[in-house]
From Swiss-Prot:
<keyword id="KW-0963">Cytoplasm</keyword>
<dbReference type="Pfam" id="PF03129">
    <property type="entry name" value="HGTP_anticodon"/>
</dbReference>
<keyword id="KW-0067">ATP-binding</keyword>
<dbReference type="GO" id="GO:0017101">
    <property type="term" value="C:aminoacyl-tRNA synthetase multienzyme complex"/>
</dbReference>
<dbReference type="InterPro" id="IPR033721">
    <property type="entry name" value="ProRS_core_arch_euk"/>
</dbReference>
<keyword id="KW-0648">Protein biosynthesis</keyword>
<dbReference type="InterPro" id="IPR045864">
    <property type="entry name" value="aa-tRNA-synth_II/BPL/LPL"/>
</dbReference>
<dbReference type="GO" id="GO:0005524">
    <property type="term" value="F:ATP binding"/>
</dbReference>
<dbReference type="InterPro" id="IPR036621">
    <property type="entry name" value="Anticodon-bd_dom_sf"/>
</dbReference>
<dbReference type="InterPro" id="IPR004499">
    <property type="entry name" value="Pro-tRNA-ligase_IIa_arc-type"/>
</dbReference>
<dbReference type="InterPro" id="IPR016061">
    <property type="entry name" value="Pro-tRNA_ligase_II_C"/>
</dbReference>
<protein>
    <recommendedName>
        <fullName>Proline--tRNA ligase</fullName>
        <ecNumber>6.1.1.15</ecNumber>
    </recommendedName>
</protein>
<dbReference type="InterPro" id="IPR002314">
    <property type="entry name" value="aa-tRNA-synt_IIb"/>
</dbReference>
<comment type="subunit">
    <text>Homodimer.</text>
</comment>
<keyword id="KW-0547">Nucleotide-binding</keyword>
<dbReference type="InterPro" id="IPR004154">
    <property type="entry name" value="Anticodon-bd"/>
</dbReference>
<dbReference type="GO" id="GO:0005737">
    <property type="term" value="C:cytoplasm"/>
</dbReference>
Length: 469
């Protein structure tokens, strides 16, 4: 893909996903097709979360006094907060923030809900919009002023061990979710200077985009007891003593849809995994005047059969050339296309085309087996799209041992570089400036006899570095 940025902008419009012409910079309109993709993606995520969490909804406005309680947390984004200062024509006694993130709105309520160890754990999530006054160049779904799809989970636990277990649960939920969508990822522990403000540590998921930069697509934070102390979230133990809760939060945003588009799209346009496709199958009847009724009767029955068996299917009966229809539905990313013409009916066959590979096959038509055939092809598409995107992520991840290779590799190939690092903040920041990259985070690795690629000290971590969005 020669110009990913241009391609991405165009595909949002051409595939009818979003309209970025809303008269406020960094805010876009979800169009029906885009919103359906968003809905199906959220459905897949909520199905995973609902196994052990409950959905809630908190208000959008946060009192300035609550936001200010966690100074370290707020410092990370205080210049990006939108403020409500008037109610009608009256100045408000206290300014209200449009939710930049939800810790300071949720945790005051946790302090009211938690009294005893019997009230724990609390494990809730919500899907809301959040606001940040981005001053950098905005881009739909990637860098925005209104995040319209912020899914965030917040938990409170009696012990540090339970909180650590929740961190692992959050990571597993996201791994399963991204695997279902065929979105590749690398997981690392963010460096101290880039962790979530106020947290003990942050685990992050990053995807390599087609232009070689990485996009952060999800994070999981162990908050320790920092916010519990700030908002006085205490509980009484069985022995009558009191402790502060241990907390975890994790979240993802509109960027999931951006990564979905980027992971699977190509020069033809969008390519969607079946789980999120508004139409999993598009039926194109090949119509001539003399046999129109025969063909449409066949395709109507096929559409009804697939629909009755839980497959999202649509039939395109417009009076357009078949080639134009193929072009349009390929651009929209429909996973499977079925063509039926008079000759196919004579031969009792249908033609099945895969969007991901372009493979075309003639399939014998039997009402008793065709549903299984279609579901099998959709399953194959899901599997193969995941394999292809994971392969790209792997092939764009490079192990480097010499510092002079860093800039050369990043500038020529992009992607993620892994190398040995001492773990010291000064060294990490020096590396970012020297090589014009960002330190993504660290992974556990056997580093015996390894030295830091930047300063030459003994290495403590395998570090992931890249250019980022």
């Amino acid at each position: 893909m020669k110009n990913f940025s241009e391609w991405f902008h165009n595909i949002l419009e051409e595939a009818e996903l979003m309209d970025a012409r809303y008269p406020i910079k960094g805010m876009s309109v979800w169009l029906p097709r885009g919103f359906q993709i968003r809905k199906y993606a959220l459905n897949a995520l909520q199905e995973l979360l609902d196994k052990d969490h409950e959905e809630v909804l908190f208000p959008m406005l946060i009192p300035q006094s609550e936001l200010a309680k966690e100074a370290i947390h707020v410092k990370g984004f205080e210049e990006e907060v939108y403020w409500v200062t008037k109610g009608g024509k009256r100045d408000l006694n206290e300014h209200l923030a449009l939710r930049p993130t939800s810790e300071t709105s949720i945790y005051p309520m946790f302090s009211l809900w938690v009294r005893s160890h019997m009230d724990l754990p609390i494990k809730v999530y919500q899907t809301v919009n959040t606001f940040r006054y981005e001053t950098k160049h905005t881009r739909p779904l990637i860098r925005v002023r209104e995040i319209t799809t912020f899914n965030e989970t917040h938990t409170a636990h009696a012990t540090e061990e339970e909180a650590e277990k929740e961190v692992m649960e959050g990571i597993e939920i996201y791994k399963t979710f991204f695997d279902e969508l065929g979105i590749p990822y690398s997981i690392s522990k963010r460096p101290e200077w880039d962790k979530f403000p106020g947290s003990k540590y942050t685990m992050a998921f990053d995807m390599i985009m087609p232009d070689g930069k990485t996009l952060q697509i999800a994070t999981v934070h162990n908050l320790g007891t920092t916010f519990a102390h700030t908002f006085d979230i205490q509980f009484e133990n069985e022995d009558g003593t009191h402790d502060y809760v241990h907390q975890v939060c994790y979240g993802l945003s509109d960027r999931v849809i951006a990564s979905l588009i980027a992971a699977h799209g190509d020069e033809k346009g969008l390519s969607l995994p079946p789980v999120v496709a508004p139409e999993q199958v598009i039926i194109i009847p090949i119509i001539f005047k003399e046999n129109q009724d025969v063909v449409l009767n066949f395709t109507d029955n096929l559409e009804k059969l697939l629909k009755n068996n839980g497959i999202r299917v649509k039939q395109d009966k417009r009076e357009l050339r078949p080639g134009k229809k193929y072009y349009e539905w390929e651009k929209r990313g429909v996973p499977l296309r079925i063509e039926v013409g008079p000759r196919d009916i004579e031969n009792n066959t249908i033609v099945i085309n895969r969007r991901d590979t372009g493979d075309k096959e003639f399939v014998d038509y039997d009402e008793n087996t065709i549903v299984d055939v279609v579901k099998d092809r959709l399953d194959s598409i899901t599997h193969d799209m995941k394999e292809a995107s994971n392969k790209f992520q792997e092939e764009k991840t490079f192990a480097i041992e010499k510092p002079e290779q860093i800039k050369k590799t990043i500038n020529k190939k992009g992607g993620i570089i892994t190398c040995s690092w001492c773990g010291e903040t000064d060294c990490g920041k020096d590396m970012e400036e020297k090589f014009d990259i960002d330190v993504l985070g660290t992974q556990e690795s056997d580093l015996e006899n390894k030295t830091c690629i930047n300063c030459g000290k003994d290495a403590s971590y395998k570090v992931l570095i890249s250019k980022t969005y």
